[in-house]
């Protein structure tokens, strides 16, 4: 069992990583006997895990209600969020309740925002079931729903009480979702840890076949890197923005193509190549390192080009609504070397458009 602490003073919390955690009531600390829980999951995961998690919580004396939401990025919306509020009010649940997010990034983000908002804030626990959510979205307290004009535009910084990563969940993960999660894994190597990037080049095949020790190390290292960044910059005023490598481009793809048509990791993968190409044009990143990124993404089964039906010019309106924009100026996360990156403003639009055009599908 691996345990990592996200250090935020009184709001610090553990990330527990192991196989078989759904069999152990102690995995869901700080829940105690007699407390009330609302389990939030989706219709795909409910048949796989809902009864198991409900059973282990009830074994510990926890009072469990549940709400099952539709599955997909397009349901990460205010309308579906209201479904959670209605379920909480109908039971009813008070300020002493705990929300448990049992699912991937959509469930985690939406449940976290529900917890931040319901009766001005209640406790919640992240139980991520996808690789992407285990290495990224469940850690750090970013919660949100989407708006038709932009991804994650309505949300709050709100930290969980704990994160429970059961490695067994990856056994039921579709191959496309596994690849999507690997995009965020590769991101950490590009922006923060060149040695980890090299490790990924050497061990990607083991990750693709869900080798236990390799996957446990991979998730632990990603969570360590994320925890260090969040502890240093919880509200993304500086260092934490680096975690958005590829996201400014990727969010444009997701919004333009319709949420869910491109998985988040797929869009981020193409976006990371666009960021590398932009950095190349500014003469601060080598084409050889761009090729290493492309090769690793392709081995993971990820796209390295944007959608062919989306012109380079179609990206800009979305990118100019990005949350990193300051005083109307687009700011991009750009790699400087493998393991080193920066947030840069003032990149000429023609440079960005040229990089995007270079990454369009033929």
UniProtKB/Swiss-Prot annotation:
Keyword tags: Amino-acid biosynthesis, Aromatic amino acid biosynthesis, Cobalt, Cytoplasm, Lyase, Metal-binding, NAD, Nucleotide-binding, Zinc
InterPro entries associated with the record: Dehydroquinate_synthase, DHQ_synth_AroB, DHQ_synth_fam, DHQS/DOIS_N, DHQS_C
Task of the protein: Catalyzes the conversion of 3-deoxy-D-arabino-heptulosonate 7-phosphate (DAHP) to dehydroquinate (DHQ).
Gene: aroB
Signal peptide feature range: none
EC number from the UniProt entry: 4.2.3.4
Annotated GO CC locations: cytoplasm
Binding positions (NAD(+)): 71-76, 105-109, 129-130, 142, 151, 169-172
Similarity annotation: Belongs to the sugar phosphate cyclases superfamily. Dehydroquinate synthase family.
Enzyme class, broadest EC rank: lyase
NCBIfam families (alphabetical): aroB
Keyword Amino-acid biosynthesis in record: yes
Free-text cofactor note: Binds 1 divalent metal cation per subunit. Can use either Co(2+) or Zn(2+).
Organism: Escherichia fergusonii (strain ATCC 35469 / DSM 13698 / CCUG 18766 / IAM 14443 / JCM 21226 / LMG 7866 / NBRC 102419 / NCTC 12128 / CDC 0568-73)
Protein's name in the database: 3-dehydroquinate synthase
Binding site for Zn(2+): 184, 247, 264
UniProt-listed GO biological process terms: amino acid biosynthetic process; aromatic amino acid family biosynthetic process; chorismate biosynthetic process
Subcellular location, record wording: Cytoplasm
């Amino acid at each position: 069992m691996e345990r990592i602490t996200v250090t935020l003073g009184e709001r610090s919390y553990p990330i527990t990583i192991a196989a078989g955690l759904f069999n152990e009531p102690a995995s869901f600390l700080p829940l105690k006997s007699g407390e009330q829980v609302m389990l939030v999951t989706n219709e795909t995961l409910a048949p796989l895990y809902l009864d198991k998690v409900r059973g282990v919580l009830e074994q510990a004396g926890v009072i469990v209600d549940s709400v099952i939401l539709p599955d997909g990025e397009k349901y990460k919306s205010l309308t579906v969020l209201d479904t959670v509020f209605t379920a909480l009010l109908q039971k009813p649940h008070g300020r002493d309740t705990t929300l448990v997010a049992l699912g991937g990034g959509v469930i985690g983000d939406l449940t976290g925002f529900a917890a931040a908002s319901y009766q001005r804030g209640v406790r919640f626990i992240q139980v991520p079931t996808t690789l992407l959510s285990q290495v990224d979205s469940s850690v750090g307290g970013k919660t949100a729903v989407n708006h038709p004009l932009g991804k994650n535009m309505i949300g709050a910084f709100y930290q969980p009480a704990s994160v429970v990563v059961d490695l067994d969940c990856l056994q039921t993960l579709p191959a496309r979702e596994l690849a999507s999660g690997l995009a965020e894994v590769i991101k950490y190597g590009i922006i923060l840890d060149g040695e980890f990037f090299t490790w990924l080049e050497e061990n990607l095949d083991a990750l693709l076949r869900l080798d236990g020790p390799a996957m446990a190390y991979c998730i632990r290292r990603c969570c360590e890197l994320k925890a260090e960044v969040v502890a240093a910059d919880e509200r993304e005023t500086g260092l934490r923005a680096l975690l958005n490598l590829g996201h400014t481009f990727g969010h444009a793809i997701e919004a333009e193509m319709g949420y869910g048509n491109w998985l988040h990791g797929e869009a981020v993968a193409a976006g990371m190549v666009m960021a590398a190409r932009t950095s190349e044009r500014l003469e601060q990143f080598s084409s050889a390192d761009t090729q290493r990124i492309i090769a690793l993404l392709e081995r993971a089964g990820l796209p390295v080009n944007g959608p062919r039906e989306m012109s380079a010019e179609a990206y800009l309106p979305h990118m100019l609504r990005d949350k990193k924009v300051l005083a109307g100026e687009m700011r991009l996360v750009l790699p400087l070397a493998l393991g080193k990156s920066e947030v840069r403003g003032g990149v000429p639009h023609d440079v960005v458009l040229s990089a995007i055009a270079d990454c369009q599908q033929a």
